[in-house]
């Protein structure tokens, strides 16, 4: 029997971080959600914890107002403590799991992982919600112990409602860590687990980005509009009503471009590499 996750940390209070936080709380997990101190505060503003915690508190507030609802019940938000990475990082001690959902930037992630390694209890599982950055690149400079307890846990938006959870192990990830997070994902979070390899954009985004990019290219070749495409690629094809372009909007065009660029740069030998070039529009 694997140990359940009772306490977790979430780093990053944006759309994904706040969604992960809310669903952890839905599953009965006590959550610490931290974000950076907002830049540009005056010296007087820096003295007020409410100002310093503004990003994390805003993420919690956004989750409480989210539609569709992120929490099963708003009272579950009582399981969440918010703070910032400068003043409150010690709150992560005692966590079974800490997951980051910050910007997809190697340098920023590496800096965070260094800080976590210097703070967390030995054996704490650390996960990244990256949509496709390579584990080996993110963990440059980290210890053997840290790498052993590290994996990718890639949730999809909106976290409460999307069944898929991708788990990806690094070369040195302990199989017991993968087992524990599989049980956590299936039994506590109610997710369907897909185990991917540490390849560009894993499984879901690799397929989804290819499909979306190919659809956009075909639209341009056929002289269609986004409205035309969505009328075809939604319910008439057995797909959700969000179809193609509404799905792209929901995912975020900036996220879609990041995933496309990552695939294009990494898949140098793929015969269909050019599909991942985002259209000029």
Predicted features along the sequence, with ranges:
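N-terminal glycine-rich phosphate-binding loop for ADP-containing cofactors
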Residues: 1-281
């Amino acid at each position: 029997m694997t140990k359940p996750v009772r306490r977790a940390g979430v780093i990053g209070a944006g759309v994904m971080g706040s969604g992960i936080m809310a669903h952890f709380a839905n599953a009965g997990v006590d959550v610490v959600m931290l974000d950076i101190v907002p830049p540009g505060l005056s010296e007087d503003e820096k003295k007020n914890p409410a100002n310093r915690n503004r990003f994390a508190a805003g993420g919690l507030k956004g989750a409480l107002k989210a539609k569709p609802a992120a929490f099963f019940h708003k009272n579950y938000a009582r399981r969440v403590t918010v703070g910032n990475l400068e003043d409150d990082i010690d709150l992560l001690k005692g966590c079974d799991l800490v997951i980051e959902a910050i910007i997809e930037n190697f340098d920023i992630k590496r800096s965070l992982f260094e800080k976590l390694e210097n703070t967390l209890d030995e054996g704490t599982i650390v996960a990244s919600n990256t949509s496709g950055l390579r584990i080996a690149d993110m963990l440059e400079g980290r210890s053997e112990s840290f790498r052993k307890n590290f994996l990718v846990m890639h949730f999809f938006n909106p976290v409460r409602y999307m069944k898929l959870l991708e788990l990806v192990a690094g070369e040195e990830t302990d199989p017991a860590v993968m087992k524990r997070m599989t049980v956590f994902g299936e039994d506590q979070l109610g997710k369907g687990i897909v185990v991917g390899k540490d390849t560009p954009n894993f499984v879901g985004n690799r397929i989804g980005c290819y499909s979306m990019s190919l659809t956009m290219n075909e639209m341009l070749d056929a002289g269609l509009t986004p409205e035309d495409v969505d009328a075809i690629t939604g319910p008439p094809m057995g797909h959700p009503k969000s179809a193609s372009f509404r799905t792209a909007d929901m995912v975020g065009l900036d996220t879609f471009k990041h995933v496309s660029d990552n695939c294009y740069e990494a898949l140098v030998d793929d015969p269909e590499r050019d599909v991942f070039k985002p259209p000029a529009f």
